[in-house]
């Protein structure tokens, strides 16, 4: 049997699916389907920079994760979306970073919201600036 979340499906637009044929993890959803009239918001890769372009948390993965999530929330808001509208994250993390700190920052921001998004994560040798430790992009679906 497939576990389906109906929280947003009542509007007939977003359905979160965790089929029993795939590993279940409360940190992410395996499949998200979108139907109907919706607005899709694409947030390009965000790094740990503040509004002046200064890098926040040089050498501190947790501080950078917190800034990245703050930037994503600001980008989502600019696009008319909220964090709970995110259906997909892509995370790029420089090899050797303490993942637990990044996940703790994510959980602190995500809180008790239902339906965590589908997630892809890749370890990389480096990013656009040598002080960047992570980058995250997101896709959000806003019911109309």
Protein language model features and the residues they cover:
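N-terminal presequence-like segments and the immediate start of the first folded domain
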Residues: 1-70, 74-87, 93-144
């Amino acid at each position: 049997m497939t576990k389906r979340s109906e929280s947003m499906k009542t509007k007939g637009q977003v359905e979160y699916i965790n089929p029993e044929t795939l590993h279940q993890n409360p940190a992410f959803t395996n499949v998200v389907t979108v139907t109907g009239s919706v607005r899709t918001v694409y947030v390009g890769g965000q790094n740990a920079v503040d509004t002046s372009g200064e890098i926040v948390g040089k050498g501190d993965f947790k501080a950078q994760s917190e800034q990245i999530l703050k930037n994503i929330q600001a980008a989502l808001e600019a696009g008319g979306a909220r964090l709970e509208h995110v259906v997909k994250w892509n995370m790029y993390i420089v090899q050797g970073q303490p993942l637990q700190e990044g996940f703790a920052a994510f959980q602190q921001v995500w809180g008790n919201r239902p339906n965590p998004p589908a997630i892809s994560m890749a370890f990389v040798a480096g990013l656009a600036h040598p002080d960047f430790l992570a980058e995250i992009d997101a896709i959000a679906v806003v019911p109309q």
